[in-house]
Every structure is written in C-alpha cells, then in structure tokens.
C-alpha cells in the first residue's frame, strides 16, 4: 500500500510541475483535420481554377501558425532594432503579408525555386533559414545568411535567389531560372515574385513573352499590397487587374490574406507548370502594415483607420487562428504556448544578432569573385587598402 501511495504521489507531483495549460492541452481530444470553404479565385484564360474547399490537418495548421507568428515577430523585432539604430540602411518589412510567404512555400516542393524583390525576410525564413541568420544579416554580423554584407535586401538560401534591390530586375532572372529547370529536364518550377509597384515595368512584359514562347515552368506572382511606395495602385496603373497582365498567359487573382487560398492556388499553378503548359500568373491581394520602408511612416497616403480595418477584419494570423479554434484543431491555450515559444526564439536570435562580431574589413571583397582576395588586377593589389584597425 505504501509503495502504491508513493507512486501515485510521484505522478501527481509530476503533473503539478507542468504548466496547467500543457496538462489541459494534452488531455483534450482534437480533430485530426477539418474542411474549409475558401474564396474562389478570379480566372483569366482558364476554364477551371483551384478548389473552393480544402482540408487542413491539425499538424499543418500548427506548423503554419508557428511560421506566420515567427515571421510577424521577427519583423516587429527588426522594427525595434532599426529604431535603436542597430539595423541600418534599407529595411523593408512584410508584417501583414505572412500568408503569402508561408502559403507559397506550402504549395511547392523544397527543390523548387523562388526569387523575389527586396521585401524578402519572410521568404528567407520559409525557404529554411533560421531567424538568427536573418536578424544577424540585418545587423551586419558574420553569422548572417550573407555574412553580414547583404543586409535587408540581399538574403539568400538554398533554392532562394534573393532579395534583389533593383525594382523588377528579379523577374527576368526568375524566367532564366525556369529556363534552367526546363533545360536540365528537372520537374521543378520557379516562383518569380514582384510587387504592384514593379508591375508596369517593360522588362516584366519581356519576361512574360520569353516564358510563354518557350513554355517555361515559371509562376509569375504579383504581390499586390495596394501601394507602390506611397502611390496607390489606382493612381499608378491603367488596369489594376494584374492577373490579366500576361494577356496570353493564364492568370489567377487570389486572396493573399488567406493562407489556405494561397496554398491551393500555388499547388494549382505549380501543377499547371509541371504539366508542360508553360507559365502562369498569380496576383496575391495582400496588405502591408508597415510603410514601404523604415523611412516611410505609412500614414501620409493612407489613414490609420484603413490599416486598423484590415488588421481587425483580414489579419492572416487571426483568420487561421479562428479557423483552428472553431474547428477543434487547436485550443486558444495551445496557440498561446506557441506564441510564447516564438517570442523566446526571436529574443534569443536578437541577442545573437547584436553580440555576434561584424565581418572584418579584409573580407569586403570575399564572395564576389571565384577566388577570394588578395589577388592582383592589372598588376595591382586593389585590396591592400582594406584593413581592419582593431
């Protein structure tokens, strides 16, 4: 009897040491999956589009929620570090657009390719890099994903080609990556992203033409967040139907604030490209909460009420959270635990990003040429002047 009482006492003591929320979550029976209706995509030159219902598993839902929260908290931490003058130079944040980067990744394979513009932090994370490598890149430290020399606009990961600072210039490169996929006979696609502000550039239409002519497996994706810097789409474009801009290329207009819509549309587009039909165009209707960059307060060309309305009615994280809680895929307590874990991860990454050393001046020319300096050009050593003083 004494042994039995002692065993019961140990079990109860172990339960008492666990947070009450964890005990509650562990004892609750959750649904394994749930079916949701999603918004129908507008179509251009397509008879059928993505499905209007989709199944979300509990496992995927928790993964998507954690990833979107991580991107959101990472961007808010970057905002804080910038205001503390720890991050310097250009910095473009994507909070509000989390459903785009997470949803696109959910619809493709790790071996597929992605290239985007300068609002790239979220995509760098979803392509597989840890938060500490992203924040360290923002602070210019050696542990950054580009050794601290790329900064906000020039981040890279496996099968992720940046992060490009020239508006629209990544689009022809994306078509070139798709050409390589076809040339090498690989069943891969390239997601080529640009914003509504770049959508009027001539080089994009040239890329459309070559991709269609050669039937390249390229998904052209316009992230329409309504404003190109401080100019609304209505003031910048004769037509704001960006999904029709490819003319002879089929297109989809997608709710970019709903991760499930983005995921299903991406799966559809990827399957279209893999079938050998050529390129397809997607317009993701989304919204950024911050200004264009850190030098833009974001309220001179739009009202605070407009931003708050989007936050209250269309926030991508809240939409996923409500779906999961209401369908018994997760509990509020469980999602709060994820929030706590994400905040700790971000804080740890921020500490690393501020404590990690900066790259020495001698490495300024590294990773530019096939061989690292010092080497002579026309008989002169151009690198001898780059010496650290400490």
UniProtKB/Swiss-Prot annotation:
Cofactor annotation: thiamine diphosphate; Mg(2+)
Residues at which pyruvate binds: 92, 118-119, 157, 165, 167, 196-198, 225, 227
Annotated knockout phenotype: Complete embryonic lethality. Normal embryonic development ceases about 9.5 dpc. Conditional gene disruption in the heart causes death shortly after weaning in male mice fed normal chow, while mice on high fat diet survive, but develop left ventricular hypertrophy, due to impaired glucose and energy metabolism in the heart. Likewise, conditional gene disruption in pancreas islet beta cells disrupts normal insulin secretion in response to glucose stimuli, while conditional gene disruption in oocytes causes reduced ATP levels and thereby prevents normal meiosis during oocyte maturation.
Modification comment: Phosphorylation at Ser-232, Ser-293 and Ser-300 by PDK family kinases inactivates the enzyme; for this phosphorylation at a single site is sufficient. Phosphorylation at Ser-293 interferes with access to active site, and thereby inactivates the enzyme. Dephosphorylation at all three sites, i.e. at Ser-232, Ser-293 and Ser-300, is required for reactivation. Acetylation alters the phosphorylation pattern. Deacetylated by SIRT3.
GO BP terms, alphabetized: glucose metabolic process; pyruvate decarboxylation to acetyl-CoA; tricarboxylic acid cycle
Residues modified to Phosphoserine: 232, 293, 295, 300
Keyword annotations from UniProtKB, A to Z: Acetylation, Carbohydrate metabolism, Glucose metabolism, Magnesium, Metal-binding, Mitochondrion, Oxidoreductase, Phosphoprotein, Pyruvate, Thiamine pyrophosphate, Transit peptide, Tricarboxylic acid cycle
Residues where Mg(2+) binds: 196, 225, 227
UniProt-reported outcome of changing residue 336 to Q/R: Decreases phosphorylation at S-232 and S-300 but does not affect activity or substrate metabolism
EC number in record: 1.2.4.1
Transit peptide: 1-29
Control of this protein's activity: Pyruvate dehydrogenase activity is inhibited by phosphorylation of PDHA1; it is reactivated by dephosphorylation.
Gene Ontology molecular function: metal ion binding; pyruvate dehydrogenase (acetyl-transferring) activity; pyruvate dehydrogenase (NAD+) activity; pyruvate dehydrogenase activity
Modified residues annotated as Phosphotyrosine in this record: 301
The reaction(s) this protein catalyses: N(6)-[(R)-lipoyl]-L-lysyl-[protein] + pyruvate + H(+) = N(6)-[(R)-S(8)-acetyldihydrolipoyl]-L-lysyl-[protein] + CO2
Major site of localization recorded for this protein: mitochondrion
Record Pfam families: E1_dh
Function comment: The pyruvate dehydrogenase complex catalyzes the overall conversion of pyruvate to acetyl-CoA and CO(2), and thereby links the glycolytic pathway to the tricarboxylic cycle.
Subunit-level organization: Heterotetramer of two PDHA1 and two PDHB subunits. The heterotetramer interacts with DLAT, and is part of the multimeric pyruvate dehydrogenase complex that contains multiple copies of pyruvate dehydrogenase (E1), dihydrolipoamide acetyltransferase (DLAT, E2) and lipoamide dehydrogenase (DLD, E3). These subunits are bound to an inner core composed of about 48 DLAT and 12 PDHX molecules.
Name of the protein in question: Pyruvate dehydrogenase E1 component subunit alpha, somatic form, mitochondrial
Originating organism: Mus musculus
